[in-house]
Amino acid sequence: MKKRVTIYTDGACSGNPGRGGWGALMMYGTVNRELSGYEPATTNNRMELTAAIEGLDALKEPCVVDLYSDSAYLVNALNQGWLKRWTTNNWTTSAKKSVENIDLWKKILKLVTLHQVTFHKVKGHSDNPFNNRCDELARQAIKNNS
């Protein structure tokens, strides 16, 4: 039976584009693990995707995952079928434009085939302590690299 893991993620950018950070909080049973990172030149959406990638990539074996993010971009792409349509349409949007962040979406595709992931949208900057912690991790990563 696969382990059930909860992951909260968030990305932040100082300027968009600008310096960026991401944070992830992984929870399995009584064990919590925090991850974070920094990019010198990026966008908020790239940081949101990177947080999810890093959280999922840190899992040592295939798991059942509940992933919580305040990024509508990330959650809607998976839950509303955007990602599936983009791959079917050779990475073009319904407006016939090239999909942004293809490199990261390809990594997410690989990870969601390895793990059984359910994506959940949470309200950002509200009263969710786990999402707020991820925001702190992302912003601290930017601050630590200033």
From Swiss-Prot:
Gene3D superfamilies given in the database record = Ribonuclease H-like superfamily/Ribonuclease H
Q: Which cofactor does it need?
A: Mg(2+)
- Under Enzyme Commission nomenclature, its number is 3.1.26.4
Catalysed reaction, written as an equation: Endonucleolytic cleavage to 5'-phosphomonoester
One GO MF term on file is: RNA-DNA hybrid ribonuclease activity
How and how many cofactors are bound, per the record note? Binds 1 Mg(2+) ion per subunit. May bind a second metal ion at a regulatory site, or after substrate binding.
Q: How does it assemble?
A: Monomer.
Kindly provide the name given to this protein in its UniProt entry. Ribonuclease H
Organism the protein comes from: Chlorobium limicola (strain DSM 245 / NBRC 103803 / 6330)
Classification lineage: Bacteria, Pseudomonadati, Chlorobiota, Chlorobiia, Chlorobiales
